[in-house]
């Protein structure tokens, strides 16, 4: 079942969500540019087109008691959670000032100061670890919850079902967030799953409450998050969210991959026509006027320039520290 969520959203929240989407978009675009010019060599999985899923984190889950665990496509989640831009860029550049000390790179971000526990290159790996975090909170009677982000490809891993089942049995305080961008690298849903299968409906049959959003309206996504947060904190039960979304660029890297022909042009055009920024600008044009958008662009551009320049001036880790913070 798709659970409807209706509520009045303040102009302040609308502006905050738009700002975060725009901020993530401009940051990822800058990373794409620097990478294509060989100024960044760490492999990157960009979230351009998918920003509306991460944007509400800055409003609803910024407190450290809400702990995020993410996938290989993690920049947006880290930034949405309140992660430091300078630390992110430093990490991607392999500098000692990075959030993981320059050792993790794009796919292995960690920043406990903001409640961002990890991102991982292993498909579905964030899911069981997030359940462990939630179990720890329950045993210790700590406030807050865990949020596990993963793509549609992760639901084809056995650990996904095992963790959902375990979370239901143990009533864990966890929100599972599936970013369904329709493709696992180059393989679309139709060749990986039975025809017309809906992920949220399938998961709901296991016994977990599930919410769905088509991903075109970031305000609707915010509403689903708010509903999920209240549900988990009040009921002490897990919940599953599926957000349809779309990545504009290649699976890994800074370029378009239209030439590969695995995605129909009309499909790409549809999603770009319904870009999350465009949708908000049209729907809330009185709130998001040109003056405000120009101000946002200038503010974000200044932050990006300062952070990139500072990261470029930062030093690489010393070889003498290569064994520091290694855990086995």
What is each PLM-predicted segment?
Residues 78-80, 186, 251, 321:
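Short acidic, gly/pro-rich beta-turn/loop elements at beta-sheet edges
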Residues 116-313:
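Glycine-rich ThDP/TPP pyrophosphate-binding loop and its adjacent helix/strand module
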Residues 29-32, 39-170, 188-195, 200, ...:
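Cofactor-binding active-site loop characterized by glycine-rich and histidine/acidic residues
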């Amino acid at each position: 079942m798709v659970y409807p969520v209706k509520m009045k959203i303040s102009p302040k929240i609308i502006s905050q969500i738009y700002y975060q989407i725009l901020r993530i978009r401009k940051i990822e675009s800058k990373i794409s540019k620097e990478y294509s010019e060989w100024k960044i060599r760490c492999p990157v999985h960009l979230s351009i087109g998918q920003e509306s899923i991460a944007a509400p984190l800055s409003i609803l889950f910024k407190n450290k008691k809400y702990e995020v665990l993410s996938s290989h496509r993690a920049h947006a989640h880290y930034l949405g959670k309140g992660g430091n831009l300078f630390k992110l860029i430093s990490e991607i550049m392999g500098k000692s000032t990075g959030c993981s000390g320059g050792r993790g790179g794009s796919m292995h971000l960690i920043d406990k100061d903001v409640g961002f526990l990890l991102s991982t290159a292993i498909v579905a790996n964030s899911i069981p670890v997030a359940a462990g975090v939630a179990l720890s909170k329950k045993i210790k009677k700590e406030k807050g919850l865990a949020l596990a982000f993963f793509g549609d490809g992760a639901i084809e891993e056995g650990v996904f079902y095992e963790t959902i089942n375990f979370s239901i049995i143990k009533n864990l305080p966890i929100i599972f967030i599936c970013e369904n961008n329709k493709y696992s690298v180059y393989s679309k849903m139709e060749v990986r799953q039975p025809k017309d299968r809906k992920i949220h409906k399938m998961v709901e049959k296991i016994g977990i409450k599930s919410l769905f959003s088509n991903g075109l309206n970031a305000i609707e996504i915010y509403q689903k998050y708010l509903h999920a947060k209240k549900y988990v904190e009040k009921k002490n039960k897990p919940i599953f969210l599926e957000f349809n979304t779309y990545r504009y660029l290649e699976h890994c890297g800074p370029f378009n991959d239209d030439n590969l022909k695995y995605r129909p042009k009309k499909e790409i055009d549809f999603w770009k026509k319904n870009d999350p920024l465009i949708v908000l600008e049209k729907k809330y044009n009185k709130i998001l006027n040109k003056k405000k958008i120009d101000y946002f662009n200038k503010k974000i551009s200044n932050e990006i320039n300062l952070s990139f320049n500072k990261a470029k001036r930062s030093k690489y880790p010393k070889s003498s520290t290569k064994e520091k913070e290694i855990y086995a």
